[in-house]
């Protein structure tokens, strides 16, 4: 990835459909059609990455493995696969299907030894998902608490994790803006890169995130705002690729 802010349109799959949830609540879905059609639409509009999520696997209510694999195999761009990656078999299945990167969430909390081994072995092919509610991590599709985020982050730093996907659960799908304070806290405590997720509602949000590239924000996952038409993907990509304004200064670290 380059010095620009990398944009990852989200394609979340539940029950075989592309959906968007509010705050990760399974019953809050809005459907947007066939996942492959949606992913190919974003690819055709210029996306270089897709954030592809198996929500059923994340919630532990089945999986969409065949659909996920089909989408990965039929795209010509980078795909980050997330949802239900909790053991070696599911990790290798996603990578063998052609995923550029795999996002590990619950396993980072429930099986730290395996997670630390994976971080060391796979390097850039793995990101750790930090799904944050308050100062706690959320696990199992955001249905359980998983410990204090800064404690888990310290352990992952010791293991050499290179990238974190940081989601503010309260903002996700709500179009209320990213949690910039949370991003600042994480960036101040890691040598790795951070991909921001949750709450992006307008191009101005992307401009602000673009200004955080110098402190470690590498990318942004955008879902609902694209699906409901708050802005177009080409317009968003233009913002993410634009030079950082001269009067832009990174936020100070937050204790």
Curated annotation (Swiss-Prot):
Gene3D superfamilies per record: Aldolase class I (3.20.20.70)
Swiss-Prot/TrEMBL catalytic activity: 1-(5-phospho-beta-D-ribosyl)-5-[(5-phospho-beta-D-ribosylamino)methylideneamino]imidazole-4-carboxamide = 5-[(5-phospho-1-deoxy-D-ribulos-1-ylimino)methylamino]-1-(5-phospho-beta-D-ribosyl)imidazole-4-carboxamide
Pfam (any one): His_biosynth
Record key words, sorted: Amino-acid biosynthesis, Cytoplasm, Histidine biosynthesis, Isomerase
Active site: 12 (proton acceptor), 131 (proton donor)
EC number: 5.3.1.16
Gene Ontology CC annotation, any one: cytoplasm
Cited CDD domains: HisA
GO molecular function, one term: 1-(5-phosphoribosyl)-5-[(5-phosphoribosylamino)methylideneamino]imidazole-4-carboxamide isomerase activity
Localization per Swiss-Prot or TrEMBL: Cytoplasm
GO biological process assignments: L-histidine biosynthetic process; L-tryptophan biosynthetic process
Pathway given in the UniProt record: Amino-acid biosynthesis; L-histidine biosynthesis; L-histidine from 5-phospho-alpha-D-ribose 1-diphosphate: step 4/9
HAMAP family associated with the record: HisA (MF_01014)
Family per record: Belongs to the HisA/HisF family.
Name of the protein: 1-(5-phosphoribosyl)-5-[(5-phosphoribosylamino)methylideneamino] imidazole-4-carboxamide isomerase
Species the sequence originates in: Cutibacterium acnes (strain DSM 16379 / KPA171202) (Propionibacterium acnes)
């Amino acid at each position: 990835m380059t010095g620009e802010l990398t944009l990852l349109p989200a394609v979340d799959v539940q029950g075989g459909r592309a959906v968007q949830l509010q705050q990760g609540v399974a019953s809050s879905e809005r459907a947007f059609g066939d996942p492959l059609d949606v992913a190919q639409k974003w690819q055709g509009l210029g996306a270089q990455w897709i954030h592809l999520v198996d929500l059923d696997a994340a919630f532990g209510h089945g999986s969409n493995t065949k659909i996920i694999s089909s989408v990965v195999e039929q795209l010509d761009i980078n795909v980050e696969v997330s949802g239900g990656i909790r053991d070696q078999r599911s990790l290798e299945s996603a990578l063998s299907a052609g995923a550029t990167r795999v996002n590990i969430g619950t396993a980072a909390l429930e099986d730290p030894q395996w997670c630390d081994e994976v971080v060391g072995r796979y390097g850039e092919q793995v990101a750790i998902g930090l799904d944050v509610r308050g100062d706690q991590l959320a696990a199992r599709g955001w249905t359980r608490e998983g410990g204090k985020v800064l404690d888990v982050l310290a352990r992952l730093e010791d293991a050499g994790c290179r990238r974190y996907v940081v989601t503010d659960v309260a903002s996700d799908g709500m179009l209320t803006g990213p949690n910039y304070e949370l991003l600042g806290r994480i960036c101040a405590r890691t040598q790795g890169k951070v991909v921001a997720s949750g709450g992006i509602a307008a191009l101005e949000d992307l401009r602000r995130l673009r200004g955080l590239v110098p402190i470690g924000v590498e990318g942004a996952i955008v879902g609902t705002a694209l699906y409901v038409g708050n802005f177009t993907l080409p317009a968003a990509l233009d913002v993410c690729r634009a030079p950082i304004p001269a009067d832009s200064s990174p936020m100070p670290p937050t204790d």
